[in-house]
Amino acid sequence: MSEKVNDTIALFISKLSEATGYQYLKSRRSLKKTIGQIVFEVLFFSSKWNDDNHIGINADFRVSYKKYGAASTAYSVVASKSFRNNTEYWYDISNKSKFDEILQYFETELQTTAVDLFDRFDKDFKAACQYLLEEKFKEYNVFFDFLVDVLGEETVMYRINEFIEQLSESDKQKIADYKKGAKDKTWMLNRSNTHFVADNGYL
């Protein structure tokens, strides 16, 4: 990757660091803040096709619970949101006008996601989890195990029931196969809400 590409991406992330108050970790190309065992990260990705004429960037927002393992691993992520540029995956920051436009977009997005959620957890941990359950469950792909751990099964049960109701007959058959030892689907091997439902006898 050329020096221009690296410098442009570094400038983009550093400006977002200033706008959000998140720490810029250059080695990970990420923004990070921590409250106790909760780690908030915005991870940036760049296209392998980037060159001086086209610089594409994208980002994911992740919330990790260090009680479950190191941050940003399959074991510890409890909520996440990917940013999508309509039909295109990459956001183009190749020239000044595009750079400024996409910077403004991400400043707005991160204020309503990463900054807002950090502030909520900083103010009231349990209330922030309740907010994830009630307002942002689908948008942030929130994990059941975390919500049950913090809020209790009774509080989270309506979301679990909603999840089960939306399963297709094929999904239910795969859960039955998993209980008999099948390991041919990604969710059977990794932590997921389907895995949680199957392992805890909800179906």
Predicted regions: what is each one?
Residues 25-31:
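Long, charged, glycine-rich C-terminal linkers/tails
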